[in-house]
Amino acid sequence: MYLAMNEKANKQWAIKEVRKDGIRDFEVVKQGLIVETDMLKKLRHPSLPSIIDVIEDEDTFLIVMDYIEGNPLSSALEEFGAQPQELVISWAKQLCDVLGYLHSQNPPIIYRDMKPANVMLKPDGNVTLIDFGTAREFKEKNLADTTCLGTVGYAAPEQFG
């Protein structure tokens, strides 16, 4: 992951680099990243990262996205323990709002890896939901809805169908 500065726009971007030489099954990983970025490119919500560009060649895959200033909720919990109720309620409302937005898409998007490490706490008090690697568009009567994915201990109960 790199931090880049677009000097013309005076904006910071994060660049995620995936190299063929660092991954055993590069094509499978690359296809997963293409699905993830194509999904995120269509979405516009203040609690979601924006994809700026995708650059690929045969050996490297780059995703240019908004830089999200802040730290994961998991870091705040490790460092400071339980958080004040007012903050937790605010974060929960924001997460419910972004999940409602994802579910309102046509077809609905199912986010399947909700956990503190995937919630970025920004300095302004807002949150951003990250890591859409296991998210997918809902498909009617798809048995994959009960496939256990995500992080054990945080997985949705319907995955244990």
Residue ranges and their predicted role:
Residues 54:
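Activation-segment/catalytic-loop signature of the eukaryotic protein kinase fold
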